Amino acid sequence: MEADWDELSRIPVPPPSPHALPTVATTIAFDDVMELLWVGNEYGRITSFYGPELQRYTSVRAHPVAEGIVRQILFHERGVISLSSRSVHMITRRGLTQWHVAHEEMVDLRCMSFTAQLNRVIVAGCQKVMFTIDIDKGVIVDKLPTEYNYTMMKKSRYLCAATDTGSVNALSLSDFRVVKSWKAHGTAVNDMDARNDLLVTCGFSVRHLGSPIVDPLANVYDLKTLSPLPPIPFHAGAAYVRMHPKLSTTSFVASQTGQLQVVDLMNPNSINLRQANVSFMLGIDISPSGEALAINDAECMVHLWGSPAKIHFNEMSKEVELADVTHRPPPLDWSPDTPLNMIGMPYYHERLFSAWPSHLVFEVGSPPAPIDTGLIPYLRPAEIGHCAPNPKKTRRYQVENTRAVATTEPALIAPKFLSEKAREQSKKSDGSVAEAAGALAGAKLNGEAEDDPLLKYSNVEIKYSRFGVDDFDFRFYNQTNFSGLETHIANSFTNALLQLLKFIPLVRNVALHHAASSCVFENCLLCEMGYLFDMLEKANGQNCQATNLLKTFSSFREAASLGILEENLTNKSLSSAIQAVNRFFLGQIAHDFRTIMPNSDDLEQRLATIASESIQCRYCGNEIVRPGNSLVNELIYPNMDIKHTRRNPAFRFSNILRASIERETQNKGWCNYCRRYQPVGIRKSVHRMPLVMMLNAALNTPMARRLWAIPGWLPDEVGIVIDGGQTLCYEGEDLRMRVQANMPGLIVYELVGVVTEIDIPEHQKPHLVSFINVAISSPEPQPQNKWHLFNDFLVTEVDKDEALRFNQPWKVPCVLAFQVKDARHAMDDSWKDALDTTLLFRDWSLNGGRPVESRVTLSEDEKPTPGTPMALDTEFVDLEKAEIDVKADGSQEIVRPSKSGLARVSVLRGSGVREGVPFIDDYITIKEPIVDYVTQYSGIKPGDLDPRTSEHNLVPLKVAYKKLWLLLNLGCVFVGHGLASDFRKINIQVPKSQTVDTQYLFFHPGKSRRLSLRYLAWAVFKEYIQEEPADNNEGHDSIEDARMALRLWKKFLEYEDAGIVSQMLEEIFREGSKLGFRPPPRNGTAAVLSRPGTAVTMQNTNSGRNTPTVPDAAGAPAVPASAPTTPGRGFRRADALTPGDGTFSGPGAGDFFGGSPLK
């Protein structure tokens, strides 16, 4: 050690994770090939540092954390070898793993060393066997038994190995037998080093029956003569030792307190002392060049000592491979106006390295095949992992191409958008409308003949164009009169179950009667079902969505805790999830029914199996009886031999149904008489069967699955008799015989439908469909059953055999619904005559907010009747922005449209004395996060929908929706602008016969443009709407918009009666094309649209509105005066208002709106 040696660097040992504390270095070693210092820690990680500055180079987790600390590091020309208690690991110096060796007999490895063969290492420890490992192959080549527990090894003339008792054995390098053994220290050897013919050891001894202390002597042995030499005295306590790599008799001895001594073994009096600034030293190592010394301490630091003038770890080191220096491009002044070609591309004159020739591209290492989710219910713990019976979905020895892109795209090719079809038809010859209708009627799934029967079971997905969902061709998937349900809504996996419940007449009747009652509870699932069922019936084959119902379903904390929401289904199969949802739905609608009719047992008669459970202790015979009513019965399958199922009547569906309804189970429960847990028997006795029997298939075993695969196993009719506390079930010929014999008490059920999980193993995600016999719920008797498949919005007719056949592995029954045969066609529509309309005639508010002054609640003599016109306008806020996928070519595809929430509803009287006066103006409270209030268009500002801060009349969505639903079922006609979009966002289905949309009234057949309400107001009345002063950003006013739509409709009726509709539309569109279909600025002047040949002038009134003044039209046909409409008069689209002054009747109405251009 030269005189200028000093501490050059000090770095902390890197922590095991970014947020963890530093850890101590358990071993340090200098690399003999490159300028690297390697450090191992207590978490199995080894890290290298480059050069005297100790720059971090590589870091690798070589051993699992459970194996503890890294005990030793060795260096080979090919890589770095590390040792932990249970494994040996080799990596390249860049960090790539070469091999990892572990063995069941490796229980406590402590040390390793090279052998006489430089491509082999021997590893040993406190265990009874040593291993020889081939470095080139990374395999164990020999196992050697030993009677010693070795803790340290150093290779020289002999293989010197220290034991856990303080001895040191000299082992032969050829056969590893013990040649010589010394008792070096009393307790343990702490450190040792061997070089050439010398061995130096440091250790602990026990003195005066105390704890072990460091020996003040470092023992020296001559390996040539196998004899001890005089020890080296070191009063500070010799804890660590290293031999100098160049000076054969010089060694470094260090104490635990940091004192360093460089001593000549042949001349102990020649010493050189240094003091390292450490609190507690844990180890030292000297570089192969002898110019650097590394120290690790208990404060998680690594110190590097050496001469500042010269320091190299090796004499001849290989160059360390470092990352290429990235040359930064020249700075560029980047702005939105900078063209992209300014970036440029690099110049190259040779073939690019990335241009691989095809003959050099190979597929290596295919990814593993994905686990079939259908196996999850059948998994059972095994000795290693889990196991399940082979579903045999592939042929023997068939290899799956796992490199195929695992897309979840639907197998059905989506049809063209309606706008694309319109453009194509417009380019064809005349008669394009008829050709388009014929092409649409002949369209088949996938655009061709339906050769593959699995196509209709595939996933269906809505595609969106820039025109939104209205541009999607739903009729491509549904040519029936039964509506499907859309899929882009959270928890829409329940669509199949909702369809099944809708086609059960007795459930449908209960839901609709409850919806027509006085229930205004916000989270009433039964009301939402009634609204949905009514919407599906009114749609008559048009697509619908269960948005409001699923939003209510998502709001239940019980559903979230049960894990049946879509966000919790990652590790649950759809079949088990939908069965849990079935139990939750029926339990919740029973609760909702009791909130309005607590004393009625109507729902229990329809859905509940009335039963009692007797629990008997098998030890003392004590018996307890308690109610055992259930809304859902779960099928229980017996243990069976599948070979005998076909001819064993005990395995028929009727017998399994009987055993499931009247079940007997054995369990362990608390006995009050014995005062301990005892084996108990539980028996269920049925007293009354429901009118609707809901069953969960509960297919959890392969044997039960094979039972369902038997053709015809599921009957479409079953009979049940309760006789003397016993339940008897019949099917097939047995049932027909008892029906003919008029068996007393026999209840015949017919199968309404089945919810089925479809899991086609061709990169399709599992989904649910339902098979339903729609003939049962038809209002008129039908001669035969008609089965339909409901696959979300794909609806098609199927035959009965296909619906009830479950021998395909991808088709799993989940939920079954049976209804008494006497209730076939029992569609009760008396709820329409018993609507509770109280909500329309009284105020309802969450916050006591004041409605607008112009709003007047309906009076009793204003009760709406069929045909009563009502002007409607709504405002919405954005709850979610649209999800857009930008493709590589720059094109954009809407994956999921923006989600809107109803924020305001305004309804105005369309006739009578108070014509044009609003009676509904409700703001709707929204609990979901609002991402954009779109105030410019909605007029809704932050705080308007919060009950704590809003000054408006706030109501729940349920109340606002129910008011509109009541008006709809009272037969009112809704007048508005763009009503289709409003109805869709409100999630209500209004027949076309009850809709007057001015967007379609003022539509020119030869023009592909729909006019805005703002432009129409100016074009027809020369009035400006949807405008506010420049310093105000209030946005639209729904009352103003609804009132203008009502006026436009009545003006259109005037045009229609005068026979000038086409001329007026031509004039409106001609003027609009000049102005860009926008109103001109207020300070501009323009001619008022009038009948051809009529001169019109414009005058600016003090009111701020441009009111036209029209002189008498010469030669114009006489127009009779009109009489005001009244609520009692029947509504007719053409003659609800005859041409007249174009104003609303009632006091002051003329001053409010101004005159008509036709006056």
UniProtKB/Swiss-Prot annotation:
<dbReference type="InterPro" id="IPR013520">
    <property type="entry name" value="Exonuclease_RNaseT/DNA_pol3"/>
</dbReference>
<dbReference type="InterPro" id="IPR050785">
    <property type="entry name" value="PAN2-PAN3_catalytic_subunit"/>
</dbReference>
<comment type="function">
    <text>Catalytic subunit of the poly(A)-nuclease (PAN) deadenylation complex, one of two cytoplasmic mRNA deadenylases involved in mRNA turnover. PAN specifically shortens poly(A) tails of RNA and the activity is stimulated by poly(A)-binding protein pab1. PAN deadenylation is followed by rapid degradation of the shortened mRNA tails by the CCR4-NOT complex. Deadenylated mRNAs are then degraded by two alternative mechanisms, namely exosome-mediated 3'-5' exonucleolytic degradation, or deadenylation-dependent mRNA decaping and subsequent 5'-3' exonucleolytic degradation by xrn1.</text>
</comment>
<feature type="repeat" description="WD">
    <location>
        <begin position="276"/>
        <end position="315"/>
    </location>
</feature>
<dbReference type="Pfam" id="PF20770">
    <property type="entry name" value="PAN2_N"/>
</dbReference>
<keyword id="KW-0479">Metal-binding</keyword>
<keyword id="KW-0853">WD repeat</keyword>
<keyword id="KW-0269">Exonuclease</keyword>
<dbReference type="InterPro" id="IPR036397">
    <property type="entry name" value="RNaseH_sf"/>
</dbReference>
<keyword id="KW-0507">mRNA processing</keyword>
<keyword id="KW-0540">Nuclease</keyword>
<feature type="compositionally biased region" description="Polar residues">
    <location>
        <begin position="1096"/>
        <end position="1106"/>
    </location>
</feature>
<dbReference type="GO" id="GO:0000932">
    <property type="term" value="C:P-body"/>
</dbReference>
<dbReference type="GO" id="GO:0004535">
    <property type="term" value="F:poly(A)-specific ribonuclease activity"/>
</dbReference>
<dbReference type="InterPro" id="IPR038765">
    <property type="entry name" value="Papain-like_cys_pep_sf"/>
</dbReference>
<dbReference type="GO" id="GO:0003676">
    <property type="term" value="F:nucleic acid binding"/>
</dbReference>
<dbReference type="Pfam" id="PF13423">
    <property type="entry name" value="UCH_1"/>
</dbReference>
<feature type="domain" description="USP">
    <location>
        <begin position="452"/>
        <end position="821"/>
    </location>
</feature>
<feature type="compositionally biased region" description="Low complexity">
    <location>
        <begin position="1107"/>
        <end position="1128"/>
    </location>
</feature>
<keyword id="KW-0378">Hydrolase</keyword>
<keyword id="KW-0963">Cytoplasm</keyword>
<feature type="compositionally biased region" description="Gly residues">
    <location>
        <begin position="1143"/>
        <end position="1153"/>
    </location>
</feature>
<dbReference type="Pfam" id="PF00929">
    <property type="entry name" value="RNase_T"/>
</dbReference>
<dbReference type="InterPro" id="IPR048841">
    <property type="entry name" value="PAN2_N"/>
</dbReference>
<dbReference type="GO" id="GO:0000289">
    <property type="term" value="P:nuclear-transcribed mRNA poly(A) tail shortening"/>
</dbReference>
<dbReference type="InterPro" id="IPR015943">
    <property type="entry name" value="WD40/YVTN_repeat-like_dom_sf"/>
</dbReference>
<dbReference type="InterPro" id="IPR028889">
    <property type="entry name" value="USP_dom"/>
</dbReference>
<feature type="binding site">
    <location>
        <position position="873"/>
    </location>
    <ligand>
        <name>a divalent metal cation</name>
    </ligand>
</feature>
<feature type="binding site">
    <location>
        <position position="875"/>
    </location>
    <ligand>
        <name>a divalent metal cation</name>
    </ligand>
</feature>
<dbReference type="InterPro" id="IPR030843">
    <property type="entry name" value="PAN2"/>
</dbReference>
<dbReference type="GO" id="GO:0046872">
    <property type="term" value="F:metal ion binding"/>
</dbReference>
<feature type="domain" description="Exonuclease">
    <location>
        <begin position="872"/>
        <end position="1048"/>
    </location>
</feature>
<feature type="region of interest" description="Disordered">
    <location>
        <begin position="1094"/>
        <end position="1159"/>
    </location>
</feature>
<feature type="region of interest" description="Linker">
    <location>
        <begin position="316"/>
        <end position="451"/>
    </location>
</feature>
<protein>
    <recommendedName>
        <fullName>PAN2-PAN3 deadenylation complex catalytic subunit pan2</fullName>
        <ecNumber>3.1.13.4</ecNumber>
    </recommendedName>
</protein>
<comment type="subunit">
    <text>Forms a heterotrimer with an asymmetric homodimer of the regulatory subunit pan3 to form the poly(A)-nuclease (PAN) deadenylation complex.</text>
</comment>
<comment type="similarity">
    <text>Belongs to the peptidase C19 family. PAN2 subfamily.</text>
</comment>
<dbReference type="InterPro" id="IPR036322">
    <property type="entry name" value="WD40_repeat_dom_sf"/>
</dbReference>
<dbReference type="GO" id="GO:0006397">
    <property type="term" value="P:mRNA processing"/>
</dbReference>
<feature type="binding site">
    <location>
        <position position="1041"/>
    </location>
    <ligand>
        <name>a divalent metal cation</name>
    </ligand>
</feature>
<dbReference type="InterPro" id="IPR028881">
    <property type="entry name" value="PAN2_UCH_dom"/>
</dbReference>
<dbReference type="InterPro" id="IPR012337">
    <property type="entry name" value="RNaseH-like_sf"/>
</dbReference>
